[in-house]
Amino acid sequence: MLYLLTAFSDGGDIFNLFRYLTFRAGAAFFTALIFGFLFGRPLIDFLRRKQGKGQPIRDDGPTTHFAKAGTPTMGGLLILSALVVSTLLWARLDNPYVWIVLLVTVAFGLIGFADDYAKVKKQNTKGVPGRVRFLIGLLIAALAAIAAAWSHPPDLTLQLAMPFFKDALINLGWFFVPFAMVVIVGAANAVNLTDGLDGLAIMPVMIAGTTLGVIAYVVGNFNLTDYLGVHFVPGTGELLIFSSALVGGGLGFLWYNAPPAAVFMGDTGSLALGGALGAIAVCTKHEIVLAIVGGLFVTEALSVIIQVLYFKRTGRRVFLMAPIHHHFEKKGWAEPQIVIRFWIISLILALIGLSTLKLR
């Protein structure tokens, strides 16, 4: 929105700064961060008053989690509000990719909010039926995939870009739409499954968001794509604003979510942030790289799938408990130990993902 002030610039005043993507990205980061610091405590106090007993704790989970009873959930509202406000202030609102990612984020956030509300109201861990959440998510992802395909250049519309190869594209035809749907819905649910320990999900989300923001900037810059041999998608650089706001809002939330957490992000935050990562990957044509950068989320989701399928077939479990972070809890790992080690893994995977821009 503030980009419009460049119309009043004579080239030598402060308004001219708004032309620069990197300046607006930095401003978006600090806007979201300050928003989180300012409104975090009032929101937590409000949620605690409204929710009473807070988020229900699973009876079959690790016994250490019982001490978390009474902690309010829906803290994702803080991240979402900071993210949306900052993006609307600093991004170019005539950019279709900004709106695609922003609307996907808000839509998945609403699904998560409904689920969190149902859990708190009923005081159980069921919430909205999984099938309902899944179908609504598929609908949102389908609309986003079609909008992204419509916005992409004609030579990229239905293509899948392959990392590690210069200008390597595979024509998926209209299979691109269901593929993109799987990416967005899969990312949303994978982050949701990862959000089981204080601070566990938000840092890997910020690391992945930073990585995808850099990728969006590169992919949207013709000179950089020409040098690196990466496909050029005009306009995606503006997603750096969104990613910067995501990281700023995430840090503001982590201030209150650090162990012992004063608030949980809930499905409101995890579904929204996962959907956002998936949408950015689809818009930038880096869906496969997302699987690398978000490898921690993929592992968490696969651990649940493997556990369920193996148990149905044999009546036995592969892991002591799924998702896999609970397996390590059952093995006696301390919660901070699991969280920090998973953060380190996420950082390593992000560096590998970034290397795909050069290793071609």
From Swiss-Prot:
InterPro entries attached to this UniProt entry: Glycosyl_transferase_4 (IPR000715), PNAcMuramoyl-5peptid_Trfase (IPR003524), PNAcMuramoyl-5peptid_Trfase_CS (IPR018480)
Subcellular location: Cell inner membrane
Cofactors demanded by this protein: Mg(2+)
Top-rank EC class of the record's enzyme: transferase
Metabolic or biological pathway: Cell wall biogenesis; peptidoglycan biosynthesis
GO process terms (BP): cell division; cell wall organization; peptidoglycan biosynthetic process; regulation of cell shape
The enzyme's E.C. designation: 2.7.8.13
Membrane topology annotation: Multi-pass membrane protein
Positions of transmembrane segments: 27-47, 71-91, 93-113, 134-154, 168-188, 199-219, 239-259, 262-282, 288-308, 337-357
Catalytic activity: UDP-N-acetyl-alpha-D-muramoyl-L-alanyl-gamma-D-glutamyl-meso-2,6-diaminopimeloyl-D-alanyl-D-alanine + di-trans,octa-cis-undecaprenyl phosphate = di-trans,octa-cis-undecaprenyl diphospho-N-acetyl-alpha-D-muramoyl-L-alanyl-D-glutamyl-meso-2,6-diaminopimeloyl-D-alanyl-D-alanine + UMP
GO terms, molecular function: metal ion binding; phospho-N-acetylmuramoyl-pentapeptide-transferase activity; UDP-N-acetylmuramoyl-L-alanyl-D-glutamyl-meso-2,6-diaminopimelyl-D-alanyl-D-alanine:undecaprenyl-phosphate transferase activity
One Pfam family recorded for the sequence: Glycos_transf_4
A GO cellular component annotation in the UniProt record: plasma membrane
UniProt keyword terms in alphabetical order: Cell cycle, Cell division, Cell inner membrane, Cell membrane, Cell shape, Cell wall biogenesis/degradation, Magnesium, Membrane, Metal-binding, Peptidoglycan synthesis, Transferase, Transmembrane, Transmembrane helix
HAMAP family reported for this sequence: MraY (MF_00038)
Family assignment from sequence similarity: Belongs to the glycosyltransferase 4 family. MraY subfamily.
Summary of the function given for this chain in its UniProt record: Catalyzes the initial step of the lipid cycle reactions in the biosynthesis of the cell wall peptidoglycan: transfers peptidoglycan precursor phospho-MurNAc-pentapeptide from UDP-MurNAc-pentapeptide onto the lipid carrier undecaprenyl phosphate, yielding undecaprenyl-pyrophosphoryl-MurNAc-pentapeptide, known as lipid I.
Identification of the protein by name: Phospho-N-acetylmuramoyl-pentapeptide-transferase
